[in-house]
Amino acid sequence: MHFKEISPIETVNKLKGILKACEIEVDETWLQKSSLNTYTVRIEIKGTGIGTNGKGISKDFALASGYAEFFERFQNNMLGTNVIVSDKVDEHGGALDGKCLTAEELIANNNSFMRLYFENRNMGNASFQDKVQNFKSVHVLEHLLNNEDTYYSLPFYNFKDGKVEFLPINSYVLNYGSNGMCAGNTSEEAIVQGLSEIIERYIQKRLFTEKPALPDIPEEYIKQFPYIYEMFLLLKENSSYKVMLKDCSFGGKYPVAALIIIEKNTGKYGIKLGCHPDYGIAMERAFTEATQGQDIFEYVNRSVIDFFNTNVEDETNICNSYKIGVGQFPYQLFGRTPSFEFAPVKDVSTMTNAEIANSWINEFINDGYDVLVRNVSHFNFPSFHIIIPGMSEMRNTSDTLFRVYNTKHLVSGLLYNADKITLDNTKYIIGTMDYFSNAQLENIVSNFYSYLEDVKIPFEELGEGCPYLTAMCYIVNKDYLNALREITYIENRIIHRKIDVNVLNWITSIKYYLSAMCELKDHQKALQYLESMFDKEYILRLDSLFDDPASVIIKQYPSSAQLENLKDNENYKRFEHAFHQYICAQKKNPINQEDIAKLIEFNSDKVTYD
C-alpha cells in the first residue's frame, strides 16, 4: 500500500467528489508512459493551464499523486498565481485566519522563525529597537498595499512549545515556498509526506555545501525491493548511459537515496533524490520524479561536470535544483572514496504513519529544531504546511532579496499599466529582470501578471520573455548597445532550436537594426541599409515597432483595458470560481491550529523510531 491508508483509486474518487461538489471542473492529461513503465498525469483547472503533476508506478498511483498534490496546493493557496479581486483578503494571500501584527509584536514573540531571521542578518544580539527598525525598513510591501505598518501573519502550531505562533506570511513564503506543504488520506500520512520532502531538500542542500563523496547502495540491498531492482537493471541495459543508486543517508540517519544517470563521454548527468522512511519508496521516488514529464534518459540534461564548482553554492543554483532538478552539483559527489559508509536506514515496515510521524517530530525536536505545522484542511482532505526553522528553508533570504520582491511588485504594477512605463522607471524593470534571469520558474514575464489568457507576451513561449522585455526597456532609453546585447543573447540561444524560421528571421532583423542604430543613430537610415538585406515584411515591422522608441512596450504588451477584459473570459472565471470556493471553504470549515496535536496523536514522551 506504499504507506497509503486507502487505495489510490479511493483517494481519487474522494477528491473528484469534493471538486464536483464545488463545481470545479478539471482536465486530466496523460503524458507518454516512460521507458521504465512509470506514468505522469497533469491535473488542471479546466481550460486554465493551472494545476499540478502526478507520477507513479501505475496509473492509479499517478492519478492519486496528481489529485493529492492539487489539493495540497489548492488548500495552501499556492495553486498558480492569485486572481486579482477587489477583496482586501487577496492582499493577504487569501488566508482568513491570520492577524495583522506590528513589527514590535512580531519581534516580541521571539519565535524560532523570527530568531533565525535576525541571526541570518548577524543581528541576533541587536537591540529590540534596532530589530524593529530593520524589519520595517525591509518589509515595505504591506505598507504599499494597505497603507498600514502591520504585517499579516498566519498561525502555526509549535510542537516543541505546545502553542500556536504567528509568522508573517510575506516573510516566511520567501524562505520556504511550498517546501513542507503536504496532503494525504490521513493527517499522519500527510505529515510523513511533508517531513519527507523537507528531509530530501535538507540533504540536497548538504550535498552542495558539504560536497560528500556518496557511497553506492549495494546491489544486494536493492534486490530486497524487486520492482526497484527491475527498473535499475532496465536502465543499465542502455550502454550509452551509466546508472548509479547512491546512499544519501549520512550514515543511516536520513532515508534519502539518489538516482544518478550519466550520459557517457559527454560530461552530462542528472541527479534526483527521493526520501521516505521506507527506503524502497525513497528509491522509487527518485525514479518516478526523474521520469516526470519526460523519458528518464532525458534527465541527463540537468547538469554537467564542472571541476571548478562554478556557482555550486549559489542560492539560485540550489533553488533551481529544488524546483526542476537543474543545477551544478559539486564534482566531489563522484569521488571514489565515500565520505561515509553505506548504512541501512531503520526498517519501518511494521510501523504505522502515526508512529512514524510521532517519532520523526520527536527526533527533530531532540536535534534542537522547532516543528511548526499549519493545518489547511478546509475541504476535509488532510493538508498542511510544515516549517522547521533552520532546516526547511528553500533559501536564506537577505534584505536585498526582500527589496527585490518589493520592486517586483512595483514592476507588476507597471506592466499592468504599460502606458505608464517611462524613461524614469524602466530601470526597475531592467534590474528586476536581470535579478531573476537565472532563477528557474521566476524568469518568466507572465509571472508578473495574475492569470493570463489569450494574451501573448513576446518570446515568452521560447523562454526568452525576460531578456526581450529588458531589450525593449533599453530601447525606450535609446540605449541601443545594451538592447543589442540582449537581442544577440536571445538569437544565440534560439538559433539551433527547431522554431519557425520567421521568428528567427525577426529576431535577427532586430539585431541588425539595433547594431545600425548604435552607429547611425537614425531610424530611417538604418532601415534604408537593411532594405537590401531583409524582405519588405521585416522592414515594415521594424519601422512600425521602432519609429517611436518611447512606445515600443505599449505596442507589444497587453494594455490595462485588455487585462481588465480578461475577467470576462470563461477560463478566467473558472479560476476565479475556484479561488472563491477556497474562501468559502475556510468560512464553512474554520480550523483551530491547536487541534493539530490531537490530530496526529503526538506524544512527546514516546519515541518509537530510534
Model regions: which residues?
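Helix-biased "structured C-terminal domain" signature
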Residues: 1-610
